[in-house]
């Protein structure tokens, strides 16, 4: 996967349209932070799903996860910063945008989410990576940039890292999830302008052309006041 990213990035750089092709476009604060504002709610939703899964599934998931969370500071930086950037550039910046040139935007989001989930390997990881891919893809589709999903992905992974370093006590875990619940309510309210912008209708979007090739070519403006 990393090799694919390097090859594609090198090609796009040579074409002098790297940021444009990967949708690393500037977005204003309300839209930029929308994904991060939704991250606590997404983490709570995933946690609820994990609670009802068979114990045998969770054993393999926990074994795979332990290798990721035991890398010290470097491991944390890889999970919270490097992985979200690389994965969002690949799955949303490269794959979703190319799919959207051939199929409607909603299908490009769905297909890229399936690929995103499948590349995580473990069935449990697919079970939460797929819906996360749908949310990340939708946000980027409406914003015309992958920066919102990069921050959302970082926030989601960061929440998991905080949980991993908590003391092993019921009180600590309860306090963590209560704080997460409060964040899931408060942050979307604070970012209501950015969230509202995502659902503003784009009258010029058409199947196969939902995402602008140039910022601002559609009447829909996700950071419009």
Regions found by a protein language model. Give the residues of each.
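Small-polar-interrupted transmembrane alpha-helices in polytopic inner-membrane proteins
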Residues: 105-120, 154
């Amino acid at each position: 996967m990393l090799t694919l990213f390097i090859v594609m990035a090198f090609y796009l750089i040579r074409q002098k349209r790297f940021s444009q092709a990967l949708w690393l476009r500037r977005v204003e604060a309300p839209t930029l932070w929308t994904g991060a504002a939704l991250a606590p709610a997404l983490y709570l939703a995933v946690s609820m799903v994990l609670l009802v899964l068979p114990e045998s599934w969770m054993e393999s998931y926990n074994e795979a996860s332990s290798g990721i969370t035991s890398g010290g500071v470097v491991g944390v930086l890889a999970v919270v910063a490097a992985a979200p950037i690389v994965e969002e550039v690949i799955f949303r910046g490269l794959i979703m945008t190319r799919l959207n040139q051939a199929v409607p935007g909603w299908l490009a989001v769905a297909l890229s989410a399936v690929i995103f989930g499948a590349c995580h390997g473990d069935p449990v990881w697919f079970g939460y990576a797929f819906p996360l891919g749908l949310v990340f893809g939708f946000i980027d589709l409406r914003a015309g940039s992958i920066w919102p999903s990069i921050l959302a992905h970082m926030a989601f992974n960061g929440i998991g890292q905080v949980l991993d370093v908590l003391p092993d006590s019921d009180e600590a875990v309860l306090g963590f999830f209560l704080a997460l619940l409060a964040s899931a309510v408060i942050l979307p309210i604070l970012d209501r302008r950015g969230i509202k912008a995502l659902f503003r209708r784009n009258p010029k979007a058409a199947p196969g052309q939902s995402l602008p090739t140039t910022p601002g070519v559609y009447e829909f403006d996700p950071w419009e006041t």
